[in-house]
Design a protein with these regions (language model features):
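Non-heme di-metal
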Residues: 1-142
Length: 142
């Protein structure tokens, strides 16, 4: 039987990151609508595609959770939907925080607590999040 995550910091980190990925998905869906209304079809499509990828990230995290109630304390962007330019900046900043700070830290904690599969998941998703940031920055620099 696999080691339980119940009561660990890894369990809290999984729920925190699941919530973050879920919220990012919704923000990107909103941002896609703004981009489309502003005439940026390609950017709208990228926001939509990235939203779908964030959904898959959230699903990978959710599958490691074991049920029950888990209390977390976390800070999340409290929702301004701006112009496409502002939304690209906000999205790039969020992705940067995930791949450069949050997920490497969560991977290290998972490793220390004896959850190598969860650590690997965070490291793999970090690579994707870096790609998301780079894509958003490419639009900003165009």
């Amino acid at each position: 039987m696999a080691k339980s995550i119940k009561g660990t910091q890894t369990e809290k980190n999984l729920l925190t990151s699941f919530a973050g990925e879920s919220q990012a998905r919704m923000r990107y869906t909103y941002f896609a609508s703004v981009a489309k209304k502003e005439g940026y079809e390609q950017i709208s499509a990228i926001f939509t595609e990235t939203a779908d990828q964030e959904k898959e990230h959230a699903k990978r995290m959710f599958k490691f959770l074991e049920g029950g109630m888990v209390e977390i304390t976390a800070s999340y962007p409290a929702g301004v939907i701006g112009t496409t330019l502002e939304n690209l900046r906000a999205a790039a900043a969020g992705e940067h925080e995930e791949w450069s700070l949050d997920y490497p830290h969560f991977a290290d904690v998972a490793e220390q607590e004896g959850f190598p599969m969860i650590a690997a998941m965070y490291r793999n998703i970090s690579i994707a999040e870096k790609g998301h940031e780079e894509r958003y920055l490419a639009f900003l620099n165009n």
